Amino acid sequence: MTIYLPELIPSHSTVFPDIENALNNPDGLLIMGGDLSSKQLISAYQHGIFPWYSNGDPILWWSPSVRGVFFPEQFSPSKSLKKFFRKSNYNVTLNKATYQVIDLCASTRPKEETWIMPEMINAYKKLANLGYCHSVEVWNEDELIGGLYGLQIGQIFCGESMFSLQTNASKIALWKFCEHFVSFNGKLIDCQMMNPHLESLGAKEMKRCDFKTLLEELSTKSTIANCYLPQILGDNSLS
């Protein structure tokens, strides 16, 4: 099947097509090209667009017809997860090891499955230096065993990836971030593509048109100051 796809011209452009122009097959594919500059990535996320492509492909930009999202105030950890965390030696931090989280999200996936290639890693680390990319870390004593990272767009957190090296680590990262995010007036966590794992954690489906409306509203509003200041979100290591 031949697909006609427009290209970002010039490659450093921050002007994207309207997301309603995305293809139906493959679902959500909008445009190709670009350079993953910080300005380009920030503009993309502000318009509900994210990069996702495989090694050897051009940069592909997506906005699927249905998003996976969390409303953090509705996130409810199971009793078993609460009990597990209470009895564990885990502790949870925010923005204490963002580079490590990005690296581990890439390296812990099978090579043929990962889209987090070296140029993506470098791009999101640059966004971290600019204060846009943030991470949640789960530790067992001094070992980093799980976490997630994503971008701050107003009152939305755009989740990029998560990893887990020990039982429940990524679930606990998400739970503790939801608690924190709500307390600082965060409203929505965008998971991009829905999948069974996210659904099992409580993610909801949202149509692209509804997401676009909510994005236009929430991207211009701010969380409470110091939301992303490096800090401890939960600590059982001394209990």
Swiss-Prot record:
SUPFAM superfamilies recorded: Acyl-CoA N-acyltransferases (Nat) (SSF55729)
Catalytic activity: N-terminal L-lysyl-[protein] + L-leucyl-tRNA(Leu) = N-terminal L-leucyl-L-lysyl-[protein] + tRNA(Leu) + H(+); N-terminal L-arginyl-[protein] + L-leucyl-tRNA(Leu) = N-terminal L-leucyl-L-arginyl-[protein] + tRNA(Leu) + H(+); L-phenylalanyl-tRNA(Phe) + an N-terminal L-alpha-aminoacyl-[protein] = an N-terminal L-phenylalanyl-L-alpha-aminoacyl-[protein] + tRNA(Phe)
Any one of the GO CC terms: cytoplasm
Keyword rRNA-binding assigned: no
Keyword entries, A-Z: Acyltransferase, Cytoplasm, Transferase
Main localization (coarse): cytoplasm
Signal peptide (UniProt feature, chain positions): none
Record's keyword annotation contains Oxidoreductase: no
A single MF term (Gene Ontology): leucyl-tRNA--protein transferase activity
Gene Ontology BP terms: protein catabolic process
Enzyme class: transferase
EC numbers for this chain: 2.3.2.6
Intracellular or extracellular location(s): Cytoplasm
Its job: Functions in the N-end rule pathway of protein degradation where it conjugates Leu, Phe and, less efficiently, Met from aminoacyl-tRNAs to the N-termini of proteins containing an N-terminal arginine or lysine.
PANTHER family recorded: LEUCYL/PHENYLALANYL-TRNA--PROTEIN TRANSFERASE, LEUCYL_PHENYLALANYL-TRNA--PROTEIN TRANSFERASE
Family: Belongs to the L/F-transferase family.
Protein name: Leucyl/phenylalanyl-tRNA--protein transferase
Gene expressing this chain: aat
